[in-house]
């Protein structure tokens, strides 16, 4: 395992443990459990913190410490608003039939697509809900055959989407910002924790979202109300918008990349915990 990966995982352990403790403390029925665990968890936090410090000092190259990553567009094959893709003849026929005009191909640096399904509310696609399409995606793929692509046609999708860690190498493409919209209204004021209030949650590694809007309409008076919570390692959000009021975008942990995205909110609308998020917003 590369040093960068170990460093990332140690950092994520600290974040996830603190989130677990916060969750216990916010649950009234688990108050005694939280108190019993607070000291052991505090000791564990110190252990992981020291381990991370030693590892960073001993194994991570000095040249990489404190340097902001500057990705080149060729890494993502974005050129003049286009995303180049490589796919089989069958998959390409489906792809072209649904007319994703803004994402037609270039010849080099193709992103390989293993299969494609469409979500269309009028029933003319493969699925009418995003959750059903996510459920149909293969589990625990290694990416060698490319991404499983979900094309979500224009519409307002009132559903809470959760992409589990076994749905690796999933790509979700919409018709554009404010065209393909996933919306919800969970909030802390209505009894949800900040962590569980998200309209869209993803923890699957190598997730990609393009041309989507993620929205939480709870309102400013409802306090924390997350539109997107991401704990997906090596995930990418390109040309997406995140709309809410408080804690709109919750970048929880691990490595994430955002490019040409819009984030809307009124207070603390971007929240992060020990994650690496090279942005180009």
Task: List each language-model region with its residue ranges.
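Beta-rich extracellular carbohydrate-active architectures
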Residues: 177, 214, 219, 237, ...
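All-beta strand scaffolds that present successive hydrophobic residues in beta-strands
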Residues: 152, 172, 207-209, 235-238, ...
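Right-handed parallel beta-helix/beta-solenoid
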Residues: 73-135
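Extracellular/luminal ectodomains of secreted and membrane glycoproteins with large N-terminal domains
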Residues: 1-83, 103
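Glycine-rich beta-solenoid repeat tracts in large extracellular/virion proteins
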Residues: 161-164, 184, 198-203, 221, ...
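Feature marks extracellular polysaccharide-active and adherence modules
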Residues: 136, 153, 164, 173-175, ...
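Right-handed parallel beta-helix/beta-spiral solenoid domain characteristic of secreted/periplasmic
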Residues: 122-123, 168-226
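N-terminal extracellular ligand-recognition/capping segment immediately after the signal peptide
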Residues: 124-125, 130-131, 144-171, 180-181, ...
């Amino acid at each position: 395992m590369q040093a960068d990966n170990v460093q990332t995982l140690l950092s994520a352990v600290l974040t996830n443990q603190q989130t677990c403790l916060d969750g216990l403390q916010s649950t009234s029925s688990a108050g005694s459990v939280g108190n019993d665990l607070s000291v052991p968890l505090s000791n564990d936090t110190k252990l992981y913190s020291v381990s991370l410090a030693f590892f960073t000092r001993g194994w991570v190259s000095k040249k990489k410490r404190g340097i902001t990553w500057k990705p080149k567009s060729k890494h993502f094959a974005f050129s003049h608003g286009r995303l180049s893709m490589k796919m089989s003849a069958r998959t390409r026929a489906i792809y072209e039939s649904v007319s994703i005009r803004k994402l037609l191909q270039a010849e080099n640096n193709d992103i390989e697509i293993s299969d494609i399904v469409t979500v269309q509310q009028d029933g003319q696609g493969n699925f009418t809900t995003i959750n059903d399409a996510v459920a149909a995606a293969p589990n625990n793929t290694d990416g060698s055959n490319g991404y499983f692509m979900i094309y979500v046609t224009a519409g307002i999708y009132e559903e809470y989407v959760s992409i589990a860690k076994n749905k690796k190498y999933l790509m979700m493409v919409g018709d554009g910002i404010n065209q393909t919209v996933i919306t919800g209204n969970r909030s802390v004021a209505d009894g949800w924790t900040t962590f569980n209030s998200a309209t869209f949650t993803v923890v699957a590694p190598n997730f990609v979202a393009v041309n989507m809007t993620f929205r939480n309409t709870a309102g400013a008076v409802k306090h924390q109300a997350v539109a997107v919570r991401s704990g997906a390692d090596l995930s990418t959000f390109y040309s997406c918008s995140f709309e809410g009021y408080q804690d709109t975008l919750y970048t929880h942990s691990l490595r994430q990349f955002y490019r040409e995205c819009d984030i809307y909110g009124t207070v603390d609308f971007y929240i992060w915990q020990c994650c690496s998020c090279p942005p180009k917003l």
